[in-house]
Amino acid sequence: MAYHGSGPQSPGEHTYDDGHQLRDLSHSNTSYEEEASHGLLSSQQSPFAGPFDDPHQQRGLTASPVQRPTSGYSLTESYAPDAAYHDPYSANQSVYSGHSENPAAAFGVPGRVASPYARSETSSTEAWRQRQAGAAGGGNGLRRYATRKVKLVQGSVLSVDYPVPSAIQNAIQAKYRNDLEGGSEEFTHMRYTAATCDPNEFTLHNGYNLRPAMYNRHTELLIAITYYNEDKTLTARTLHGVMQNIRDIVNLKKSEFWNKGGPAWQKIVVCLVFDGIDPCDKDTLDVLATVGIYQDGVMKRDVDGKETVAHIFEYTTQLSVTPNQQLIRPTDDGPSTLPPVQMMFCLKQKNSKKINSHRWLFNAFGRILNPEVCILLDAGTKPGPKSLLYLWEAFYNDKDLGGACGEIHAMLGKGWKKLLNPLVAAQNFEYKISNILDKPLESSFGYVSVLPGAFSAYRFRAIMGRPLEQYFHGDHTLSKQLGKKGIEGMNIFKKNMFLAEDRILCFELVAKAGSKWHLSYVKASKGETDVPEGAPEFISQRRRWLNGSFAAGIYSLMHFGRMYKSGHNIVRMFFLHLQMLYNWFSTFLTWFSLASYWLTTSVIMDLVGTPSSSNGYTAFPFGKTATPIINTLVKYIYLAFLLLQFILALGNRPKGSKLSYLASFVAFGIIQLYVVVDALYLVVRAFTGGAPMDFNTDDGIGAFLSSFFGSSGAGIIIIALAATFGLYFVASFMYLDPWHMFTSFPAYMAVQSSYINILNVYAFSNWHDVSWGTKGSDKADALPSAKTTGGKGEEAVIEEIDKPQADIDSQFEATVKRALTPYVPPEEKEEKSLDDSYKSFRTRLVTLWLFSNGLLAVCITSEGLDKFGFTNTSTERTSRFFQALLWSNAVVALIRFIGATWFLGKTGLLCCFARR
């Protein structure tokens, strides 16, 4: 059930909305829109006042509805007696200790000071830091809580179960809540583990464990969401989409697999890996706390002085929060109800990059859970209806499939309004064509060069061994352990290669010795993601992609011989050889793309714009007088902006040169459209007759081919245009997905030259920038430490605050309010840094110097300047220039000589009359 308030509704295409209010979700694809259109913080309609009010208790009542408290978040009905509940203040339960609790942490008590839990005027980060101290008993107030003694596993591993708020417990359907076969605390307690070890040491032998393994459950599907600093809307978009996809899998009725070995939901684990406390958006933590997978105040900075590396939370929940900040909870046993989902939340204490997050996923959690399939998602990627099911089915039906990916397409907004941005439209077209032409081709060969980390899947046993070993060489946290094989011992080429580490994993998987794993593309599985909307972000993103893919592509070609050690059959090896030749050829074309684009532009303009005997002394489009002049200007502008790209790339960050890059995109776009018009003119002339396209169609096929492929090159241009325009249209209609040809193709044609002239130039000019290391500082000082107590011969224990359930619920009420507050994007400051301003001045100075000198050289030596009114020939202009230059140098030398002579004479005279 979705709870609605007064916010605006914003449904979009291919989303999850059925537009219903306070109704169960239907099981059709239309149910995949975020189910709510209004904010939860407005007044609620009776009889269900709050998001956690239990509708089961209301059904069948004929009397007047039960009176609720005035709060829209009343948890009164959630304080139901529970056999597992105990009062920490009652006798024989625990003893009081010196731990104090900030009185501001208590809620609903008149006269209490404002709490950081409800403080809206304080930044979310600062309020979060205060909550850690307050909730953990580190405040300066007088409130005292009872404590309990927690034994460390094997004397060193801190793993504690914390009661979840009553509202979360009671949101679980009774059939799951009352079933104690799996685990008595699975739905009543959240498990927290402070991992003070490297991911490779997170093993059962060292005392670490995970709930699914503790409950002896087989994990078929491990769904991982990697996160850096995305806001709560982006995170909820991904997490809610995953929850709905799991519902699709659980609702399968005829699947032989899911009817074996217990309920389907027990075979699926969702793992969120956050890359550092400091960059993490603290509002996102409120969303996770609302569904039960996180609590404030339980994390420990260190255990007996040993620093915590990762904070791991585990809980099984039936709650979800939509991107519109609407809370979804089960209401009945219908197909629209979300099933229980086993969740793990790994919050790394320090930012150590995405590849390290994957090491936690595969080497730490994967080895304990031993899943069959791992699905990788980036926070912000929204899986489409049944997308995860289609990915899993691909592995289920192909025992040799080692990895797969779905179709990623750009998020276009409501009514496709983002297509008005040419950059977004161009990227949309690029993604679509890649999914129509490139991915199917590579899938046919059996080796997809890259499975995007934002939306891909791997068979866990396929990547175990050498593939993961090679993959994790790029983890800088292993640099000391690996030595020369690690990131610190790599040359600049290998470091760039690990900017596209997913390509390395794909190659190593296919080339795995003694195995015959192949990769595939699953067209039915779709994911939606945001794309950069501004030039600086776009350029920075593509720098990493282009440099990483180029280096990884060369690596795979140079190490192709390792394929002979694999277990592929002769047919597969034949196709892999074809793909190798195709990749060599593509790399060759990519290397010379800069010159190719300039020559193509120049040749097409000369063909249609230069009057000659071969074209009847005509010129398109401005006539035989103006067209050559304009074409010459266009060429000079093209070369000038191309030179500018090198100046910008070698000295500036894209964010520090926004206007320059914007002007470059516009200039190259206008030139590209001008060339496209010229090329279309060639095609028209080819089929209407007329020089230079007057093909011989009267003397047989031989004469026609001879004229078609003649020295003018017009026939080749027609073939290239047909291969570009025609192939894109035909393939798009074959895949029944042609809309991008009408909405995005024109924008792509305008931006296409910028892909070469701007993106490639910037990428290669910044080959040295591999962006390794942590981003920013890592602040964990807000977290309390855990210290053991106990004398000699006694087991090491830690005293942990044992809060009463009423206080847990009161604090949770404020957490829900924060989580469901409508998201307001922060304003981005456009101010340049001091370093950027210095670099911008340097760029303007160098640009002025180079272009003024270049303009002088062109004016003196160019033969075509007579078109601009210069009456002299280039030879005569050169002669006069040298005369002026020689006279100028002579005058300067004469002045210097006069000055030197005067100084010498003056010095001699003064020497004679100087006083001794």
Swiss-Prot record:
The N-terminal disordered region controls its phosphorylation state and is required for its proper localization to the hyphal tip, but not essential for septum formation. It holds the Pfam family Chitin_synth_1. Disruption phenotype: Leads to severe hyphal growth defects with enlarged tips, a high degree of branching, and disorganized lateral walls. Its main location: membrane. One of its GO terms (cellular component) is cell periphery. It comes from Emericella nidulans (strain FGSC A4 / ATCC 38163 / CBS 112.46 / NRRL 194 / M139). This is Chitin synthase B. Interacts with kibesin kinA. It catalyses: [(1->4)-N-acetyl-beta-D-glucosaminyl](n) + UDP-N-acetyl-alpha-D-glucosamine = [(1->4)-N-acetyl-beta-D-glucosaminyl](n+1) + UDP + H(+). InterPro entries: Chitin_synth, Chitin_synth_fun, Chitin_synth_N, Nucleotide-diphossugar_trans. The chain crosses the membrane at residues 544-561, 588-608, 629-649, 664-684, 716-736, 845-865, 884-904. It is a multi-pass membrane protein. It is found in: Cell membrane; Cell tip; Cell septum. Induction: Expression is ubiquitous throughout the fungal body and relatively independent of the change in developmental status of the cells. It is an enzyme of class 2 (transferase). GO terms for molecular function: chitin synthase activity. Residues 1-75, 118-141 are annotated as: Disordered. Belongs to the chitin synthase family. Class III subfamily. One of its GO terms (biological process) is cell wall organization. Coiled coil: none annotated. Residues 14-26 have a biased composition (Basic and acidic residues). Residues 59-75 have a biased composition (Polar residues).
